[in-house]
Regions:
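N-terminal cap/lid segment of alpha/beta-hydrolase-fold proteins
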Residues: 16-46
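Short, surface-exposed "cap/lid" segments of acyl-processing enzymes
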Residues: 45-88
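Glycine-rich "HGGG/HGxG" loop immediately N-terminal to the catalytic nucleophile
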Residues: 63, 89-111, 307
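Alpha/beta-hydrolase active-site loop
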Residues: 107-133
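Conserved hydrolase catalytic core segment
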Residues: 137-142, 146-175
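Alpha/beta-hydrolase
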Residues: 176, 180-271
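Conserved alpha/beta-hydrolase "acid-adjacent" motif
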Residues: 277-283
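Catalytic histidine-centered segment of alpha/beta-hydrolase-like enzymes
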Residues: 305-316
């Protein structure tokens, strides 16, 4: 009787530890009064290693890598349990980050907020914090969807210091553009329930196939609605979302040309589901080929997964695939360092 009780207490303690998400606000020097939020789950003991998660175009960290399907069950918690300081960045205007004044004005009054050129700077702020304040020496970035564009640009700028770059569901398809494509303002809007319905990907999944986890069906839309302030005068449940990411995706040079891949000297992993609407086998192969200076390149397709596989029933395969790549990178780094040391003697 005592053994099951102790086991239950130990499991509860582990879950509670994994749920301790610390959120820090990091100022944006170029924008006085504005800040980005970084959500972190610490490992049991410091390792000097971190995984930084970068979200996509419409919803923030705590609806993505930080979404808890059950106590202690999130991608952040998974990475922390494996010894990494697991952090997720909310870009400006998303989640717990600040909202610039333009998000309270009509969208046509300002250019798109948090476009890739600005998001690169925000990733740099998070990485600088991890290195200087959390004493991290090894940083792996895991980016999703549109977030893979600024993450790649940051990897190119970071001059080989980044340990690895994972591109989950990158934007490898060219989106149709015509003269009727509207110009983007500062922000766009959607209700949480509308975005949830989009996550079901009914247009590409077989009629009887449902991939979303039950916890997403139960809690995701309400959590998304609570993640952003409601602006008086907007319709009930309407969320204002920075338009920079959508403007990047719709730009004439979008698709493969969006990625500053040719100068990246970091190991790269492209992972996606067979039902992903933004990348397929050919697109993933073409994008990976652009990383001509990357010393290690992996590509993985996980069947029965969509563009939001991190919210679906096969998410643990995604977690494990990324973890395997990260550990392969670290093993290679150790082997290379050992070889260099032996050669020097």
């Amino acid at each position: 009787m005592l053994a099951p009780l102790l086991l239950g207490l130990a499991s509860t303690a582990a879950a509670n530890a994994a749920d301790r998400v610390e959120t820090v606000q990091l100022p944006i020097a170029q924008m006085p009064g504005q800040h980005v939020a970084l959500h972190c789950v610490a490992p049991r003991r410091p390792s000097g290693k971190s995984v930084l998660f970068v979200h996509g175009a419409s919803f923030p960290t705590m609806l993505a890598a930080g979404f808890a399907f059950a106590p202690g069950d999130s991608w952040l918690a998974y990475a922390a349990e494996r010894g990494y300081l697991a952090c997720g960045l909310d870009f400006l205007g998303f989640g717990a980050s600040s909202r610039p004044a333009a998000m309270l004005a009509p969208p046509a009054d300002a250019p798109p907020i948090s476009a890739a050129r600005d998001a690169v700077t925000q990733i740099g702020i998070a990485v600088a914090y991890l290195r200087s304040q959390r004493h991290v020496t090894t940083v792996h970035i895991v980016a999703h969807s549109w977030g893979t564009i600024p993450a790649t640009a940051f990897a190119a700028r970071d001059a080989g210091r980044l340990a690895s770059l994972t591109l989950f569901g990158p934007i490898a398809h060219e989106h149709a553009k015509d003269d009727d494509t509207p110009a983007f303002g500062a922000w766009w809007s959607i209700t949480a329930r509308e975005r949830y319905e989009q996550l079901r990907f009914r247009q590409v999944l077989p009629a009887t196939t449902v991939l979303l986890e039950h916890a997403v069906d139960e809690r995701w839309a309400n959590a998304f609605e609570a993640s952003a302030p409601h602006v008086p005068g907007d319709r009930a449940g309407e969320l204002r979302i920075p338009a920079g990411p959508l403007a990047d995706i719709a730009a004439p040079a979008a698709g493969l040309a969006s990625y500053a891949a040719g100068t990246v000297e970091t190991p790269v992993f492209i992972v996606y589901g067979n039902y992903d609407t933004e990348v397929d086998d050919a697109g993933a192969a073409a994008l990976l080929a652009r990383f001509s200076r990357s010393p290690l390149k992996w590509r993985l397709r996980i069947d029965d997964g969509s563009h939001v596989m991190h919210l679906e029933t096969h998410r643990r395969s995604l977690y494990a695939g990324v973890d395997a790549f990260v550990r392969a990178v670290e093993a290679t780094r150790v082997a290379d360092a050992t070889h260099r040391g032996s050669s020097a003697r």
